[in-house]
């Protein structure tokens, strides 16, 4: 099924996923398209941060759903 991942800059990335894909796998697909390592990605759907070991189906993600991508950059001093 096709879903979209929207970045904070408004860019939309289209991904083809399966309902039983884990969130971790969705992040890997984002990395393949955008080069953002999964540990830096936070995916939000329906106002909730998605846990890596849950599946798209666990969050009731359907074809046409839009996930929001937030980058979790580690700051250092």
Curated annotation (Swiss-Prot):
Function according to Swiss-Prot or TrEMBL: Ubiquitin-like protein which plays an important role in cell cycle control and embryogenesis. Covalent attachment to its substrates requires prior activation by the E1 complex uba-3-ula-1 and linkage to the E2 enzyme ubc-12. Attachment of ned-8 to cullins activates their associated E3 ubiquitin ligase activity, and thus promotes polyubiquitination and proteasomal degradation of cyclins and other regulatory proteins.
Origin species: Caenorhabditis elegans
Phenotype when the gene is knocked out: Worms either arrest during embryonic development, or show vulval eversion at the L4 stage and burst at the vulva during the L4-to-adult molt. Those who survive to the adult stage display severe defects in terminal differentiation of seam cells, vulva and male tail.
Subunit and interaction comment: Interacts with dcn-1. Covalently attached to cullins. May interact with atx-3.
Compartments (UniProt record): Nucleus; Cytoplasm
Region feature (Interaction with uba-3): 70-72
Post-translational modifications reported in the UniProt record: Cleavage of precursor form is necessary for function.
BP terms from Gene Ontology: modification-dependent protein catabolic process; negative regulation of apoptotic process; negative regulation of DNA damage response, signal transduction by p53 class mediator; negative regulation of gene expression; positive regulation of apoptotic process; protein neddylation; regulation of proteolysis
Location, primary (coarse class): nucleus
Annotated site location: Interaction with uba-3: 8, 44
GO MF term list: protein tag activity; ubiquitin protein ligase binding
Residue numbers covered by the propeptide annotation in the UniProt entry: 77
Position(s), cross-link Glycyl lysine isopeptide (Gly-Lys) (interchain with K-? in acceptor proteins): 76
Taxon lineage: Eukaryota, Metazoa, Ecdysozoa, Nematoda, Chromadorea
Keyword set, alphabetical order: Cytoplasm, Developmental protein, Isopeptide bond, Nucleus, Ubl conjugation pathway
InterPro entries given in the database record: Nedd8-like, Ubiquitin-like_dom, Ubiquitin-like_domsf, Ubiquitin_CS, Ubiquitin_dom, Ubiquitin_ubiquitin-like
Any one of the GO CC terms: nucleus
Protein name: Ubiquitin-like protein NEDD8
Family to which the UniProt record says this protein belongs: Belongs to the ubiquitin family.
Record-linked PANTHER family: UBIQUITIN
Key word DNA-binding present: no
